[in-house]
């Protein structure tokens, strides 16, 4: 299963009072931007070869998703990969600027691990190509996590409605 989580563009943001939980109440108006997206793929199974989770099909043949060719001067992203301690999750993150965070701490990995606590999910491979700017306030990581929760619910027939998905998402934090 593959999708493109969009970022959000804030048209207006007013930071209100600080709450007792350390977060702030916000008054905001934003729109999703479908021009700036990451690429998220989740595959069920535990074959953790380097060609899993789209790596071979996306970059092995020097091509991108959608069969767009890389130009000669375009860089192939840097990959960072990890497998969870229980061996049920392999996550690969690709980013042109390099991956400068532990990938098992990525919100997509955290989303899988959170659902796995309650549902004992099958093994999966997650591939995330980060093209949205990291740390720019566009909510790319949160969108990736939300789509991960939704995709896992659909893939494994968990039947999580939007309210339950939002509850899980809130446990992951906010940006």
PLM features: residue spans?
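Alpha/beta catalytic cores of group-transfer enzymes, especially the acyltransferase/condensing modules
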Residues: 158-175
């Amino acid at each position: 299963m593959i999708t493109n989580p969009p970022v959000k563009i804030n048209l207006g943001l007013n930071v209100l009072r600080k709450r007792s939980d350390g977060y702030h109440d916000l008054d905001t108006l934003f729109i999703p931007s479908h021009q700036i997206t990451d690429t998220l793929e989740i595959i069920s199974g535990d074959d953790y070869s380097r060609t899993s989770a789209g790596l071979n099909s996306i970059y092995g043949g020097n091509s991108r998703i959608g069969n767009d060719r890389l130009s000669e001067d375009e860089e192939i992203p840097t990959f960072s990969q990890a497998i969870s301690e229980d061996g049920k999750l392999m996550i690969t993150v690709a980013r042109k600027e390099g991956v400068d965070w532990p990938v098992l701490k990525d919100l997509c990995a955290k989303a899988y691990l959170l659902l796995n606590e309650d549902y004992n999910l099958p093994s999966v491979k997650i591939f995330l190509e980060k093209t949205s700017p990291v740390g720019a306030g566009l909510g790319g990581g949160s969108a990736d996590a939300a789509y991960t929760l939704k995709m896992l619910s659909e893939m494994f027939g968990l039947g999580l409605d939007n309210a339950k998905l939002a509850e899980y998402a809130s446990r992951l934090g906010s940006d």
